[in-house]
A protein has these predicted regions:
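N-terminal export/targeting and maturation segments
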Residues: 5-94
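N-terminal Sec-pathway targeting helices
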Residues: 1-3
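Extracytoplasmic electrostatic interaction patches
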Residues: 87-193
């Protein structure tokens, strides 16, 4: 008996500041539309996050709301129960699926709408993961002040792209890990201005 095994290696998305900038420029209108539509579904004081695997399987979701929503991790029971809980915050399985499809078309993994942040409300888009690092776009509702831009750029894991968008790199066990390629990227952009 002959047994042949074939292994396919799926390349990881390149998570460099230059690649993130290029992807953001290519998708910024789609990102803004996704954020605007998703926020229109949610009550004012409700934050929401959802994350999918590379293959589109729901891996995590969460809600911060005054409304009590019963969810236990990814699985919250039957489809009827899921629909009932999601409707409490203006969502449905169909709406979650449309978020998944929009993220998948842009090759992104997740969305997190944060309300009542220390700086301002913002939305995070999970750009990609490499090893134990997660790379995100943080898109603020209000422009960042000069002093805040300076402070954020001094953080090892953040790069201020513009007054509304910050690139972040979060490592599972070390929140102060260096964003790979950060200083070369900032130096290049400082010289080009």
């Amino acid at each position: 008996m002959l047994c042949i095994a074939v292994f396919a290696i799926i390349p990881q998305k390149e998570c460099t500041p230059e690649r993130m900038e290029a992807d953001f420029r290519a998708n910024h209108q789609k990102i803004e539309m996704l954020i605007r539509i998703t926020r229109s579904w949610l009550p004012d004081s409700t934050g929401f996050s959802v994350e999918y695997s590379k293959h589109g399987k729901l891996t995590d979701w969460g809600v911060s709301s005054k409304q009590e929503v019963n969810f236990q991790g990814v699985e919250i029971g039957s489809q009827k129960e899921q629909e009932k809980e999601l409707r409490k915050i203006g969502l449905s399985l169909e709406r979650l699926d449309s978020v998944r499809l929009a993220l998948q078309k842009m090759d992104y993994r997740g969305l997190s709408i944060n309300k009542g942040g220390a700086i301002s409300d913002y939305t995070e888009i999970v750009y990609g993961k490499t090893g134990n690092k997660e790379f995100n776009y943080r898109i603020y509702d209000k422009p960042l002040a000069d002093s805040l831009v300076y402070k954020l750029n001094r953080c090892y894991n953040l790069i201020v792209y513009n007054r509304y968008v910050v690139f972040s790199c979060v490592e599972d066990f070390d929140y102060d890990s260096l964003f790979p390629g950060k200083y070369a990227y900032l130096q290049k952009h400082t010289l080009s201005k």
